[in-house]
């Protein structure tokens, strides 16, 4: 095994570990705010504007059925609203309400504060993160390119 291959394997293991811990941290932040990570994700994908459930599901990499369940919860708590879709009468657009936007803003503020503390504890600066991002994106591009 080459050194590069060994380092690649370690990187993959560390990325999985980082993603898992980050996900659990997000779940904790959401729970403390009386939300779920799933609701937070759907609110986040709607922050750019109204979307259909299938469109939101594609963006999140989830099934439309799972996103529909979360949207149902968000509709019940007035976090989102269904508005007519001029392009498809049977597939309404789901839009954030003012309450949904406020919830998303609170969650984002809590998350940003937690991430800032993490970066300070790790002693990591923006340039280190940019380099790591460039490396990961090059690997992703290579994996996505046939050959």
Language-model segments: which ranges?
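N-terminal leader segment of winged-helix/HTH proteins
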Residues: 1-33, 138
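C-terminal regulatory/oligomerization modules of transcriptional regulators
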Residues: 1-3, 124-147
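Short, locally clustered residues in the helix-turn-helix/winged-helix DNA-binding domain
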Residues: 16, 44-48, 108
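A structural signal for well-ordered alpha-helices, especially hydrophobic packing surfaces
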Residues: 19, 104, 140-144
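N-terminal helix-turn-helix DNA-binding core of bacterial DNA-binding proteins
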Residues: 25-66
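Charged, amphipathic alpha-helical coiled-coil/dimerization segments
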Residues: 72-131
């Amino acid at each position: 095994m080459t050194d590069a291959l060994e380092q690649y394997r370690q990187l993959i293991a560390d990325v999985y570990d980082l993603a898992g811990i980050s996900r659990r941290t997000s779940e904790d932040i959401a729970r403390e705010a009386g939300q779920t990570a799933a609701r937070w994700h759907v609110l986040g994908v709607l922050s750019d504007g109204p979307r259909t459930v299938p469109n939101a599901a594609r963006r999140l990499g989830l099934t439309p059925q799972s996103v529909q369940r979360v949207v149902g919860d968000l509709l019940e708590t007035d976090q989102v609203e269904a508005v007519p879709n001029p392009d498809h009468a049977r597939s309404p657009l789901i839009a954030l309400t003012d309450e949904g936007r406020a919830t998303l803003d609170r969650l984002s503020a809590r998350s940003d504060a937690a991430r800032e503390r993490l970066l300070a504890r790790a002693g990591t600066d923006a340039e280190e993160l940019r380099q790591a991002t460039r490396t990961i994106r090059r690997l992703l591009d290579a994996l996505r390119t046939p050959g």
